[in-house]
Amino acid sequence: MPDYQKEIERIGEFLRKIIADRKAVIGISGGIDSSVTLGILSKFFLHENIKAVFMPDATTPKSDYDDVDVLASTFGVKYSTVNIQNIVDTFSKTLSAVDKGAIGNIKSRIRMIVLYYFANIYNGIVVGTTNRTELLLGYYTKYGDGGCDVEPIEHLYKRDIYEIARLLGVPESIIKKKPTAGLWQGQTDEDEIGMPYSKIDDILSSIFDKGELREDPDFKKILDLHSKSDHKRRLPYSLSPD
């Protein structure tokens, strides 16, 4: 088993080097990834140097509000709440947007804009919360939750995040809840992807860590998701100077 306590220390020192004397700006949702990232920040930075922002919308369940409250209290960090629904409504009305997926991506990009607003006024660094599972699947919004200055947990699979969450003392209600990107009502990651994270991590590790390929429908599905999301992991295409 990996030494997760040592990994927490490694991530913390990495963040200290990157953020230095600036403010860490992080979006929190009551989900496992942002909770773990906030927990690590709270161990390595003065709490007044952490700007945590909760950005609910009309589809955000009350349980997320409660979990964010308990999370902030657990780690002794104050947070701001910015309800983005009015902004979402303005975009949707202006664009006559009705596609659920497109509106979900609008929400994610609005949250990115809000975080960079706070980074702007506080001379801060936006801290991302994408994990390795999401990165390899492309399960994040380009220039949305994928838009940040540093990704401290991007090398960790979802299963690693849960182990670190327990070490940090992340509230049990957050550890037990079904992961969701919060893009529409009732959405869960595993339902949308079509398989549990435990299986996804096993397949991703087999492919990308061990170089194993199998004639298996689930392997094919994961490889297809990885291939179709390749553009998310690349810088924009450009020409080289003559």
Swiss-Prot record:
InterPro entries, A to Z: NAD/GMP_synthase, NAD_synthase, NH(3)-dep_NAD(+)_synth, Rossmann-like_a/b/a_fold
Family matches, as Pfam families: NAD_synthase
Binding sites annotated in the UniProt record for Mg(2+): D33, E134
Gene Ontology cellular component annotations, sorted alphabetically: cytoplasm
Pathway: Cofactor biosynthesis; NAD(+) biosynthesis; NAD(+) from deamido-NAD(+) (ammonia route): step 1/1
EC number(s) reported in the record: 6.3.1.5
Any one GO molecular function term: NAD+ synthase (glutamine-hydrolyzing) activity
Residues reported to bind deamido-NAD(+): R109, K142, D149, H231, K232
Enzyme class: ligase
Record-listed ATP binding positions: G27, I28, S29, G30, G31, I32, D33, S34, T129, K158, T180
Keywords: ATP-binding, Ligase, Magnesium, Metal-binding, NAD, Nucleotide-binding
GO biological process, one term: NAD biosynthetic process
Catalytic activity: deamido-NAD(+) + NH4(+) + ATP = AMP + diphosphate + NAD(+) + H(+)
Membership in a protein family: Belongs to the NAD synthetase family.
Subunit structure: Homodimer.
Functional note: Catalyzes the ATP-dependent amidation of deamido-NAD to form NAD. Uses ammonia as a nitrogen source.
Protein name: NH(3)-dependent NAD(+) synthetase
Organism, scientific name: Thermoplasma volcanium (strain ATCC 51530 / DSM 4299 / JCM 9571 / NBRC 15438 / GSS1)
Gene: nadE
